[in-house]
């Protein structure tokens, strides 16, 4: 399951696009617009479900579709609180000796409710969260699960989580859920947190170049120094699925090269578990 965080703001400094590029107003706002669009896509799927379908088993282990949406609601409530007040105020923070997955699962089990209540709670929470992040000081970091993030980076994690859990919901339902250009934010997040993921696993935090084909099949999204010895290439959709642990790297068409490419592909994440 995981709670979606770019683990350290030092490794996930805000850009919304490529690391190292200046942030203009349009780039700053695009992440919020794209987060809203991703949430609206999920809302359309959920609005058509009957009560029985809410109880279907999702692709998130141990959770029904209603459980997944409840988790998203709880996470958005926490995001709204931190974007407004700068801290989680007793939300989904993790205590010593507890994993994020365990904390999230416990929170869901404590607050299960009827599907209509869960759906309405998520709708309120996601609207409040998006409004709070838009209104927040763009340069002032706020507390998130295991570190501090600027609001646009926080929004990127919310986009990553809604997209991945959207896959968890759409798959069992057989709902249409095509890849979109919004994956660029998620791919950026996955690449930007690679140094942390590598170092935590005891691997050298060496530069890794990612060259990813966008969903339109024409654009190529490039992250990382062009002269990096290690690289990952392939479809952006597969890269994002691997980072979300929705696809085994060995079953993807992604190619890793150089001394650290294979380790980077194995360890890439858009969240901390």
Where are these regions (language model features)?
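Acidic interhelical loop/turn segments
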Residues: 47-58, 127-154
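Basic, Lys/Arg-rich alpha-helical nucleic-acid-recognition elements, primarily the DNA-binding modules
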Residues: 27-62, 67-70
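C-terminal interaction segments
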Residues: 227-273
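Short, contiguous alpha-helical
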Residues: 55-96, 144-200, 239
């Amino acid at each position: 399951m995981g709670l979606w965080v770019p683990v350290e703001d030092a490794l996930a400094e805000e850009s919304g696009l490529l690391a190292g590029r200046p942030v203009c107003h349009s780039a700053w706002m695009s992440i919020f617009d794209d987060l809203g669009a991703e949430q609206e896509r999920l809302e359309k799927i959920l609005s058509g479900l009957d009560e029985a379908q809410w109880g279907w088993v999702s692709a998130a282990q141990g959770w029904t579709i209603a459980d997944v949406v409840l988790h998203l609601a709880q996470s958005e409530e926490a995001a709204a609180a931190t974007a407004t007040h700068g801290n989680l105020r007793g939300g989904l923070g993790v205590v010593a000796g507890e994993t994020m997955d365990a904390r999230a699962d416990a929170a869901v089990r404590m607050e299960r409710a009827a599907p209509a209540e869960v759906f309405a709670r998520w709708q309120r929470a996601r609207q409040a969260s998006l409004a709070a992040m838009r209104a927040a000081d763009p340069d002032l970091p706020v507390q998130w699960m295991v570190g501090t993030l600027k609001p646009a980076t926080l929004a990127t994690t919310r986009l990553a989580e809604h997209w991945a859990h959207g896959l968890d919901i759409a798959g069992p339902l057989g709902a249409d859920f095509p890849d979109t250009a919004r994956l660029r934010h998620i791919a950026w997040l996955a690449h930007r947190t690679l140094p942390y993921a590598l170092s935590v696993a005891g691997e050298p935090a060496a530069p890794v170049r990612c060259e990813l084909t966008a969903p339109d099949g024409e654009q190529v999204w490039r992250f990382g120094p062009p002269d990096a010895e290690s690289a990952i290439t392939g479809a952006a959709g597969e890269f994002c699925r691997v980072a979300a642990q929705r696809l085994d790297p060995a079953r993807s068409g992604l190619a890793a090269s150089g001394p650290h490419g294979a380790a980077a592909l194995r360890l890439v994440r858009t969240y901390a578990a």
